[in-house]
Amino acid sequence: MTVSETLAALKTQKGIEPKASYTGTEDTDDFIFAVQTDSSSQTKESAWIVCADHVKEHSGALNATTADEAFIRTGTVTSKTGTQRTFSINGNRCVGDDFQDFALSHKIKYGTGSDVIVPYIYFSIRTGKGESGSAVLIVNSDVGGAANASATFAMDVKAVGTPVEFDYLEANPQSNTDTAKPVKA
């Protein structure tokens, strides 16, 4: 399912659509993680493929790198030298799901280098705000599970470089039905 199809379904089924003025809580289900699986036909983020069908988790984490240095009369000081965005994705196998068919393909499972780097977006369906960048897809398990259980998969997604801010409403102005002015944090 594409980003635009997912948002249309959320609007129809649950009355949820991105609004810059949204304030309130967000649940895990309020975030979309999507990747570009075909650069020739998916030229806009709205056409990218959403990671959702039979997915139990797409947890985002920020992994900071640091350097400790000792200074005279100051002692040890920790400096932050960078941050890498990572996602942990796992769920039940579902043949025919566009995301899983791509992510669990032979090309991705056994690929190396730039063959396994894809553009991604990660944003809130409540506000439309998030990030975009490129990431490495690393499949850790393509078929897991015990006897009589659903087959499972697990993968890590690690950003390449620093992602940039992303706003779905700015990238897709026709989706912006919010007439209220955004509230600054």
Q: What residues fall within each predicted segment?
A:
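Short, low-complexity, polar/charged sequence segments that are solvent-exposed and flexible
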Residues: H106-T112, V139-V143, A154-K158, S175-T179
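Acidic-enriched, low-complexity/disordered segments with a strong bias for Aspartate over Glutamate
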Residues: D27-D30, D38, D53, D68, ...
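Short beta-strand and beta-hairpin "edge-sheet" elements
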Residues: K56, I121-E165
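Viral virion structural and adsorption modules
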Residues: M1-E5, K158, T162-A185
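Extracellular/virion structural assembly segments
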Residues: A70-S134, V164-Q174, K184
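Solvent-exposed edge beta-strands and adjacent loop segments
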Residues: T2-N90, V136-A151
